[in-house]
């Protein structure tokens, strides 16, 4: 008890920071002086020690008062935390010792659990406002230490006294702990004399236990209170001023209730049935305890002598026996009983000692005492035989404990039994030894018998083992030699392959040069034909006859050409160059017919020409012999046999090429249907098909010749004029070009053609003939569009396919329609033509045809399968239609029907969508039966050069030798090696890394290249120039306004920065970015882009509501309040007391007139009545008959008269009172005043309008205060109660209001305010201020609209459009919206309305909303709220505004959030945009390159620096699907609806080819030749096992054995 009390006493000291111990002492009568409380903690040794401690503390203390106070607060805080931990951990502080968990104490070790508890933020002292704001748990340890050190430095700079204060607080804590320990020692040493025990009053035996327990509890409470008061406080008594004060005594009244019987309402329970409860327990004890007296003096503070004496008496007289509590009940032992029990236990322990130690009959077995057992030794382990006849050898059982007295007979029997056991044991041992010896002898002789056989067998096994090891070593050596040989062979083949590739590239460049030279020569030849027309006519007849005569020699020359081509295949590149070095000189002009009798020199020259043509065709024909005959230069016209032979070989070629490129999945058409179609095709094209040589044969030899019916079109067919302006492609104009005579039956047409042939112009670096504008075309063409028509016409005349890659908005559609009109008007080729377009622009193409070329029969192929089948009926008939327009999806779905139809021109719009050459759809379109192909695209490159290769191969595959396409386009690996990898290096070298806000598109990237890089780009331009036409708006339309792009960097708002950093600091985000999973990374990047666009896309602002509690706090006092109100509202006394008689009811006087009351007051006569009453009083007072004598009649009569006088006096007094009461009545207000007020308030007269305007009704007042309520009702309470109205409004009033509301008589005027205060929606202005981009957009739109500009706002996310709508509505801008949900028929109406109405300043659109032909030239500003993943989509959006018809400069603003993922994406996109200038722009082409991004480049965050720099490589074609999966569910649905049209178009091209496609149709998949593919396969196999190729001998040097093995393998004698 003393220990617990001491600890509780210490607790009270620590928990109260400042002690005020002397308040109660002022109440004691002994101490009249008041003690002033002080904050010092005293020592119990006296005031002298206290002074020394204070002086010592003042000397050691160098801190000022505030710092000293701060140290004291830190000490108290640490001890309070210690105390709180004790309470939370142990639920009590009764046994708490502050020294246990103190950090200042050197003797105690702080437990880990307390260390964790004290590190919680609420239990730590913060020196700065921002010292603990940031959570460092997710930061690496190195950064944590750095941040902590920085904080410490800042705190030391801010609080230089921090270390001193902390040290002082530790010293104070140590001093306090020392004082506590000293106080404990003092209490242990103190001795208090016990006082005599207090006799309790008479109690029953049954109540004795209860009273004792109550006394113990009371003593504990008194002791706790005493210890609390006797705490060692530092004395506040100064001997100099309080020397007369010796001691202070005061008493505390005892508790009133010490027994249940002391409670007034307590009654014993009559149903109590316990045995321990008897009748005496119900006896009420009259107990009067003494008051507790406290004594305080200078030496001892707060002592209670009487309680201390009781405690000492109790401890001295307390005895308790040591008994088993489980088997005994609750004993209340007296001293006699205690002594008796102790004596019994002592005797019992003595007996146990005798039995266990002396007699040794008992033993302690664990916790039990048991009888000791007799132990016999185990004789089974006896090793030596014992002599049974010796007494000392006998085994006698040994017993522990008391010796057992056995007889001789007992010993004899035990000895015999022991001897018998020994005998049996010896016998068993002898038998075992005999068996062991026998087995050893047996094994010895067996081993001796088979020793020779065993040795021979072991020798044979050793030989086999050695042989096997030798064989394995030799085999391993041969395997290594085979691997080395294959490796060496692969190296040689790779070197040869590289050499052949370089030679092939040179040949391609020569072919392009020759092709352009031939086109130029042909143009010059056409000019010379105008001057020599009459001569050509005669020459035509001569040449025709000569050709007929020389038919056989021509065939012979063809055969010789085949043989010479076979010889050319055996020659090297240098030999071929030497052989065909004079190819240009061999082409000499000749206007005369060459007969079979010509000179040898001329025939040799002709042979060289034929060989040159043949060699080049073979050179670019995949080493295949061309079966197309090439006419000699001397022949001006083919003979009939030659035409028949050329037509036959041409058909065979077409069949072979279609078979080589066909797909297994596309060969399920019926034979009968194909036959019918072929017959119809032949009938359709009998009059329009021409058998003309194409490719180099057409350029270097004669121009294409038509049939007799189409001979008048020969002049226009010869209109090819592609002449290169490169320095390396110089031409010789002085040379005489060969003339190409032609036969024509219509001289008028020839004259017309000759007039048009004179005009020529330069297009794409080549001179092409200016063709006449077709009369079928309605409208006028711009100059550059007319040039495009000339270029397209030259492609057709030369039999070459091409790509029209003009920038979006330059009119590729009208140029295509002009080409078809030109073919119909000039060449009488009406079709049929197939135009494949995206689904979204099918209607646009049909409208363009009806607008510009209504003479064509256009079949728009769409609808359900039944509708499409109906449209196919009869379409094989001649002139059923001229042009068929369909979509990619339908043309692939019905590819069988389209394959059976023969098409003159197949035109693919938006051809960049067929960039995936591995898909089955690409191969299906490749196998269509078409004579010419034209691709239309605004972006020939989107991602890489391989897509450009895919388009070029689609135009003219390598299997079609009659096409002039080089074989290099069929070899993907070589093309990628030549151009793909160098261009990637160009990007790295030429990226200037500038961060300018304005991008200059006129900057020539090649100016910053070195010579080698410039040559590579020049070669690429040289190869592509004959087949691709690319014009930009800024080049062809000089009067077109400029385009300027600005980068606007937007700072993140506070909320955006918090969400962005919070997402980046998550451990899950770091793991996802480091994992490399493309889908997960894209999901993370999409979330970051949402934060940058608007934080509501990432996390919506919450709607704040109050916590509704069913009851308020005052509800618990409702019952008490109702009782009090009931008594206060009790009106029962009003019936017993008349307030009116007492003149207290002042309200009843309101009807009295004031003037009447004045008149009535004059009637007051109470003074007269009072005089009479006074006289009667005198008479009555003189009377002496208070108690008359009844025997005396006279006295009794006088007494009666006296009583009558008293009655009269009382009546007079009462009359005087009533007179005064009634005459003194004066009204509070008066009747006149009340009537006047009633008159003023009663609506007796109608109110005026002015009065109604001034005095507002409640509804009008609510309406007027609507703005005030809207602005200032913003504070939503945290908690509300539902029953508060019941506490404030009476039930009767509530019922009345409810009835009125039900009858619709009244409305709630506070409804809006209640709603505003109960639920708080986010303010609409936060939509702008939560986002940095919207803040910039608000400023930008304000400036744009003020200057009369109109803007297009593009975004990728559909939800951003919703946010922009809210933003524009808030600012009051008129706008229009276009997304994927807009119908096709409404799209054109919206665009026309926007272009027409200049009052609409803003048009918001989705970048993927479809409608590639949308014209929005009414706007001159484009704002990209967020950039698309693919820059090509953004470029198309720019072209919707910056196109033909725009009259103002176009400014493009791109919003980028700085220091985020968007800035990193923009930096990488600008890097890749340099390819736009390198490959296409400067080579008159273009590209939008979306290179490979790595996670490290995109994130660029210091916290995620451990992310590997690995590029993101998703599955080919699945990027859109991955991006769609990264969207939210709602946003995904909206985006799918918005991009529905684009999805329909894209799904035609995004399908990946299956793995079996390459193996099933090897000829259809472009790639290297057979040998090359074998090399690649073997290379892969070797590379997979390169690590296993570890031969030390081979690395040291090849020995003679290794050389022999390699030669042996090279000769083909080794097989694996």
Swiss-Prot record:
Residues 529-538, 705-737, 752-763 have a biased composition (Acidic residues). Residues 1-53, 185-238, 521-565, 583-614, 645-774, 992-1013, 1545-1576 are annotated as: Disordered. InterPro entries: Helicase_ATP-bd, Helicase_C-like, HSA_dom, INO80/SWR1_helicase, P-loop_NTPase, SNF2-like_sf, SNF2/RAD54-like_C, SNF2_N. Transmembrane segments: none annotated. Residues 11-26, 1555-1567 have a biased composition (Polar residues). A motif (DEAH box) lies at residues 909-912. It comes from the Eukaryota. Belongs to the SNF2/RAD54 helicase family. SWR1 subfamily. PANTHER family: HELICASE SRCAP, HELICASE SRCAP-RELATED. Component of the SWR1 chromatin-remodeling complex. This is Helicase SWR1. It comes from Debaryomyces hansenii (strain ATCC 36239 / CBS 767 / BCRC 21394 / JCM 1990 / NBRC 0083 / IGC 2968) (Yeast).
């Amino acid at each position: 008890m003393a220990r617990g009390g001491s600890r509780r006493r210490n607790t009270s000291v620590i928990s109260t920071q400042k002690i005020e111990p002397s308040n109660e002492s002022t109440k004691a009568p002994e101490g009249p002086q008041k003690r002033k409380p002080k904050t010092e903690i005293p020592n119990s040794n006296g005031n002298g020690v206290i002074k020394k401690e204070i002086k010592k503390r003042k000397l050691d203390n160098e801190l000022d008062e505030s710092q000293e106070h701060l140290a004291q607060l830190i000490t108290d805080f640490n001890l309070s935390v210690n105390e709180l931990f004790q309470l939370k951990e142990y639920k009590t502080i009764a046994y708490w010792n502050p020294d246990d968990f103190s950090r200042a104490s050197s003797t105690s070790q702080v437990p880990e659990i307390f260390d964790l508890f004290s590190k919680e933020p609420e239990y730590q002292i913060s020196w700065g406002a921002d010292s603990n704001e940031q959570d460092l748990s997710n930061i690496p340890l190195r950064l944590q230490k750095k941040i902590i050190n920085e904080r410490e430095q800042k705190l030391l700079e801010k609080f230089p006294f921090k270390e001193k204060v902390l040290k002082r607080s530790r010293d104070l804590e140590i001093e306090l702990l020392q004082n506590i320990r000293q106080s404990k020692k003092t209490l242990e040493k103190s001795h208090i004399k016990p006082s005599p025990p207090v006799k309790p009053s008479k109690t029953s035996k049954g109540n004795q236990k209860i009273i004792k327990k109550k006394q113990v509890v009371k003593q504990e409470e008194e002791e706790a209170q005493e210890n609390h008061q006797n705490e060692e406080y530092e004395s506040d008594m100064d001997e100099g001023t309080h020397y007369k004060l010796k001691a202070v005594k005061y008493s505390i009244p005892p508790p009133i209730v010490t027994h249940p019987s002391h409670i007034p309402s307590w009654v014993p329970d009559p149903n109590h049935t316990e045995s321990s409860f008897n009748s005496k327990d119900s006896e009420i004890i009259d107990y009067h305890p003494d008051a507790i007296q406290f004594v305080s003096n200078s030496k001892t503070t707060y002592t209670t002598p009487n309680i201390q004496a009781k405690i000492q008496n109790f401890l001295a007289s307390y005895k308790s026996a040591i008994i088993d509590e489980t088997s005994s009940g609750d004993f209340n032992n007296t001293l006699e009983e205690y002594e008796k029990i102790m004596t019994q236990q002592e005797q019992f322990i003595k007996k146990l000692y005798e039995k266990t130690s002396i007699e040794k009959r008992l033993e302690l077995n664990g916790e039990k005492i048991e009888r000791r057992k007799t132990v016999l030794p185990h004789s089974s382990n006896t090793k030596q035989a014992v002599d049974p006849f010796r007494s000392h050898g006998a085994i006698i059982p040994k017993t522990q404990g008391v010796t057992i007295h056995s007889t001789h007979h007992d010993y004899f029997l035990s000895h015999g039994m022991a001897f018998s056991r020994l005998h049996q044991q010896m016998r068993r041992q002898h038998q075992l030894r005999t068996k062991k010896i026998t087995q050893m002898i047996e094994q010895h002789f067996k081993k001796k018998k088979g020793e020779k056989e065993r040795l021979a067998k072991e020798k044979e096994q050793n030989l086999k083992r050695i042989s096997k090891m030798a064989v394995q070593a030799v085999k391993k050596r041969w395997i290594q030699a085979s691997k080395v040989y294959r490796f060496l062979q692969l190296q040689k083949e790779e070197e040869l392959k590289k050499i052949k590739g370089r030679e092939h590239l040179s040949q391609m460049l020569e072919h392009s040069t020759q092709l352009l030279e031939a086109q130029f020569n042909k143009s010059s030849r056409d000019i010379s034909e105008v001057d020599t027309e009459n001569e050509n006519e005669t020459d035509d007849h001569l040449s025709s006859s000569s050709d007929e005569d020389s038919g056989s020699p021509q065939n012979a020359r063809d055969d010789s050409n085949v043989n010479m081509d076979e010889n050319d295949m055996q020659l090297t590149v240098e030999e071929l160059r030497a052989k065909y070095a004079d190819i240009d000189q061999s082409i000499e002009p000749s206007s005369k017919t060459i007969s079979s009798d010509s000179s040898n020199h001329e025939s040799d020259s002709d042979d060289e020409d034929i060989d040159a043509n043949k060699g080049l065709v073979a050179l670019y024909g995949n080493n295949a012999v061309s079966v197309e005959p090439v006419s000699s230069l001397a022949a001006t016209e083919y003979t009939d046999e030659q035409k028949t032979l050329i037509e036959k070989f041409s058909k065979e070629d077409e069949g072979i090429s279609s078979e080589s490129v066909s797909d297994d999945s596309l060969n399920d058409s019926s034979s009968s249907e194909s036959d019918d179609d072929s017959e119809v095709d032949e009938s359709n094209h009998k009059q329009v098909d021409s058998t003309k040589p194409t490719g180099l044969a057409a350029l270097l030899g004669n121009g294409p010749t038509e049939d007799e019916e189409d001979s008048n079109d020969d002049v226009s067919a010869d209109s090819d004029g592609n002449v290169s302006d490169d320095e390396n492609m110089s031409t010789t104009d002085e040379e005489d070009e060969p003339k190409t005579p032609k036969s024509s039956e219509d001289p008028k047409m020839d004259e017309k053609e000759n007039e048009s042939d004179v005009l020529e112009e330069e297009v794409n670096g080549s001179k092409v003939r200016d063709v006449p504008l077709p009369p079928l075309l309605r409208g006028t063409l711009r100059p550059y569009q007319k040039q495009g028509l000339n270029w397209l016409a030259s492609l057709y005349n030369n039999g070459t396919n091409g790509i029209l890659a003009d920038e979006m908005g330059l009119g590729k559609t009208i140029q295509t329609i002009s080409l078809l009109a030109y073919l119909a008007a000039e060449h009488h080729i009406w079709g049929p033509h197939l135009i494949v377009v995206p689904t979204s622009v099918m209607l646009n193409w049909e409208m363009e045809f009806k607008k510009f070329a209504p003479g064509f029969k256009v079949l728009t192929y769409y609808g359900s399968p039944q509708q499409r089948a109906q449209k196919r009926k009869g379409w094989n008939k001649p002139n059923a239609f001229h042009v068929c327009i369909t979509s990619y999806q339908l043309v692939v779905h019905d590819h069988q029907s389209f394959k059976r139809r023969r098409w003159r021109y197949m035109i693919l719009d938006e051809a960049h969508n067929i960039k995936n050459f591995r898909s089955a759809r690409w191969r299906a379109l490749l196998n269509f039966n078409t004579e010419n192909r034209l691709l239309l695209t605004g972006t020939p490159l989107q991602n890489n050069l391989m897509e450009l290769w895919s388009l070029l191969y689609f135009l003219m595959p390598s299997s079609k030798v009659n096409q002039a396409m080089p074989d290099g386009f069929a070899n993907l690996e070589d093309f990628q090696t030549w151009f793909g990898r160098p261009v990637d290096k160009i990007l790295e070298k030429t990226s200037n890394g500038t961060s300018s806000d304005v991008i200059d598109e006129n900057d020539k990237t090649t100016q910053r290249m070195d010579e080698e890089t410039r040559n590579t780009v020049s070669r690429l331009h040289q190869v592509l120039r004959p087949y691709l036409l690319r014009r930009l708006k800024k080049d062809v339309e000089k009067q077109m306004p400029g385009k300027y792009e600005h980068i606007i960097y937007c700072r993140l708002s506070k909320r955006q920065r918090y969400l962005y950093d919070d997402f980046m600091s998550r451990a899950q985000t770091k793991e996802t970015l480091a994992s490399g999973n493309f889908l997960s990374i894209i999901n993370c990047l999409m979330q970051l882009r949402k934060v940058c666009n608007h934080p509501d896309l990432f996390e919506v602002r919450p709607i704040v509501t109050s916590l509704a509690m069913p009851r308020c706090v005052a509800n618990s006092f409702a019952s008490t309040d109702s009782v009090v109100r009931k008594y206060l509202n009790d009106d029962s006394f009003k019936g017993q007391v008349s307030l009116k008689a007492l003149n207290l009811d002042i309200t009843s006087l309101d009807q009295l007139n004031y003037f009447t009351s004045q008149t009535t007051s004059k009637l007051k006569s109470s003074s007269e009545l009072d005089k009479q009453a006074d006289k009667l009083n005198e008479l009555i007072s003189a009377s002496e008959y208070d108690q008359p004598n009844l025997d005396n009649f006279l006295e009794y009569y006088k007494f009666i008269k006296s009583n009558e006088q008293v009655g009269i006096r009382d009546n007079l007094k009462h009359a005087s009172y009533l007179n005064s009461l009634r005459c003194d009545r004066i009204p509070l207000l008066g009747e006149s005043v009340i009537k006047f007020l009633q008159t003023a308030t009663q609506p007796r007269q109608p109110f005026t309008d002015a009065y109604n305007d001034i005095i507002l009704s409640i509804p009008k007042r609510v309406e007027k205060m609507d703005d005030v309520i809207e602005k200032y009702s913003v504070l939503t309470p945290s908690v509300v109660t539902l029953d508060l109205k019941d506490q404030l409004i009476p039930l009767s009033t509530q019922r009345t209001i409810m009835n009125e509301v039900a009858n619709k008589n009244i409305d709630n005027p506070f409804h809006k305010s209640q709603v505003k205060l109960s639920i708080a929606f986010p303010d609409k202005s936060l939509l702008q201020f939560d986002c940095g981009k919207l803040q910039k957009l608000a400023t930008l739109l304000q400036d744009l609209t003020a200057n009369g500009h109109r803007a297009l706002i593009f975004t990728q996310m559909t939800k951003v459009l919703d946010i922009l709508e809210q933003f524009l509505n808030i600012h009051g801008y008129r706008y229009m919206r276009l997304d994927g949900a807009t119908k096709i028929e409404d799209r054109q109406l919206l665009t026309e309305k926007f272009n027409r109405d200049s009052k609409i300043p803003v048009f918001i659109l989705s970048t993927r909303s479809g409608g590639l032909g949308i014209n929005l030239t009414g706007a001159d500003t484009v704002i990209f709220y967020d950039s698309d993943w693919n820059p090509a989509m953004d470029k198309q959006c720019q072209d919707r505004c910056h196109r033909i018809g725009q009259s103002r400069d176009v400014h493009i603003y791109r919003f980028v959030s700085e220091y985020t993922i968007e800035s990193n994406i923009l930096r990488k996109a600008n890097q890749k945009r340099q390819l736009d200038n390198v490959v296409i722009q400067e080579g008159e082409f273009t590209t939008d390159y979306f290179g490979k991004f790595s996670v490290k480049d995109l994130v660029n965050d210091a916290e995620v620096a451990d992310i590997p720099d690995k590029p993101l490589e998703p599955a080919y074609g699945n990027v859109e699907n991955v991006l769609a999966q990264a969207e939210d569910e709602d946003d995904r649905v909206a985006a799918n609806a918005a991009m529905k049209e684009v999805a329909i178009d894209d799904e035609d091209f995004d399908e990946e080819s299956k793995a079996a496609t390459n193996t099933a149709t090897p000829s259809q998949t472009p790639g290297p030749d057979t040998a090359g593919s074998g090399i690649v396969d073997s290379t892969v196999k070797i590379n997979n096992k390169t690590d296993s190729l570890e031969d030390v001998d081979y690395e040291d040097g090849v020995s003679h054995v290794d050389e022999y093995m390699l030669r042996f393998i090279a000769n083909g004698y080794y097989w694996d």
